[in-house]
């Protein structure tokens, strides 16, 4: 057997096989299995841009701006705080996003794409097609884009895990009780948009009241929560408004309901005007009416030319929305009508556009872009790529011939690690190091638990637990972490392998030793090949948001929160991609291994700490015990007859006995005939956590 990967000959399903980077992936055996002609696909999408349909005619004969808005609004729901939202799942097809006011008429964009999706079928996801359409739209209008990666996977129902806000109505003002703001306009975490139903800021101004400087403050918060800095904010705002127009040449009161509320005969289309003509020049979407630039189907620097060459005044659109229009503009600088080139109209700016002119920091950047069109094009192309790929995960997940070669810091780059080394020899060195089971398991867990299935960031690969900011996180117990790393790093150096591999291998060894102490001989699967990230290629501010505020698996809360400890555990469980039964078995195992944060004894329902037994579940479900509050969210476990305190516990521990679903799992693991199943299931879930970010093994 190759020593590149370890396997057990036991009865556990997880012990047989296990992919390693040294084995052939499916693509090596069947390299043509993807079978998507990407060049032909791009040609079809490009042709779509100028193939205007009578049922929803293209502005100026070009659908580019509509496709860009669709892609922008798909990707723009991403928020860095929890990694949720974004364009990697095609969630714009479902409620609530398909019916948000800010997404009005994007249902038409997706219907225009349907013939292409129908043609290519399963070879491309809706998520990929939506983002590709926006990127190709820019290319068709003259922008040299930075690149594009396939690899997004569709979901097939509305997402239930995303908190979009507490409001009960669309576009509720921030002054209304129960909203998303508190204090001095402090936006609730993890939200990024300023209103329910918007992607980012209100284009008319804060709560619909024009004031560019106030809007600039909203923009800075919103874009920062989308992982964008000031330069990227200016580039995206200006680049997004270089092409296309707003639609408000009509009466918004005549629009029908959104797609989710539309009549069955409307077949999923919303905002239909069944009273008057509501297409072309008469379409109503945001209520603002007009184009930003003189040539709305051409990539150029016209946005900055108009913004800075003219004074602007507030006016109302035909639909009654606030917008800015130029004073004394030359006729030749006006964009032509979307249907009749003999007619010209005033261009417009939103309050967000005017923020680029009035906010001092934004203006500096905008003036630089105005003077250097090439710099603007490059900055926008990079920002657009980041916007549309931020939630796609590391570069190893990118698919296709248009992937840019350059590694970008926001991709959290990790170099490839070695796979050709003697795993058993390294494990022997770790075993001789004197580290405890608790130290080995806790360190590996802390390294891996940062993984988020939402945007596929974090995880053990890269061993960023040894770098800032993670090496100072309270949840990682910095003093203990430093002591453990002082032992493991020399082992990695002596073996010329990554610290990341050694950390995980040490955790696996700890689990094996604990299983042996419980009377079960197993070998935890291990796949070498992790690399070590560098501090220089780690964006500290970007990683700050991955800091755990609580970890139910290690029975720890950083401080008191409005939500319960068990709710925080469920949120982390969902982000890590774990199921209810995996959560259950991991908590029970981690407790008996003595991995509680700070060495607390809460929930350690065993007299055999360090042995991977099912004692936690046996004692949790034992009716000889009673449970009593003891203050500060803690509980005592007492003998029912004597009243003697046997253990202490937290709400996290009690929920596995009180919740009917979790108790059902707990009872399974408490059974006398499931002691080995408990070990096997723990190892399976453990292995899933340790390899959650090993996308190189999933190709």
UniProtKB/Swiss-Prot annotation:
InterPro entries to which the protein is assigned, alphabetical: Catalase_peroxidase (IPR000763), Haem_peroxidase (IPR002016), Haem_peroxidase_sf (IPR010255), Peroxidases_AS (IPR019794)
Cofactor stoichiometry and binding remark: Binds 1 heme b (iron(II)-protoporphyrin IX) group per dimer.
Assembly information from the UniProt record: Homodimer or homotetramer.
Active site: 73
Post-translational changes noted in the entry: Formation of the three residue Trp-Tyr-Met cross-link is important for the catalase, but not the peroxidase activity of the enzyme.
Enzyme class: oxidoreductase
EC number: 1.11.1.21
Pfam families attached to this UniProt entry: peroxidase
Swiss-Prot/TrEMBL site (Transition state stabilizer) positions: 69
GO CC terms of this entry: cytosol
Gene name, Swiss-Prot/TrEMBL: katG
Record keywords, A-Z: Heme, Hydrogen peroxide, Iron, Metal-binding, Oxidoreductase, Peroxidase
GO terms for biological process, alphabetical: cellular response to hydrogen peroxide; hydrogen peroxide catabolic process
Protein's organism: Aeromonas salmonicida (strain A449)
Binding site for heme b: 241
GO molecular function: catalase activity; heme binding; metal ion binding
Protein name: Catalase-peroxidase
Function as written in the Swiss-Prot or TrEMBL entry: Bifunctional enzyme with both catalase and broad-spectrum peroxidase activity.
Cross-link (Tryptophyl-tyrosyl-methioninium (Tyr-Met) (with W-72)): 200-226
Family designation: Belongs to the peroxidase family. Peroxidase/catalase subfamily.
Reaction(s) catalysed by this chain's protein: H2O2 + AH2 = A + 2 H2O; 2 H2O2 = O2 + 2 H2O
PANTHER family: CATALASE-PEROXIDASE, HYDROPEROXIDASE I, BIFUNCTIONAL CATALASE-PEROXIDASE
Cross-link (Tryptophyl-tyrosyl-methioninium (Trp-Tyr) (with M-226)): 72-200
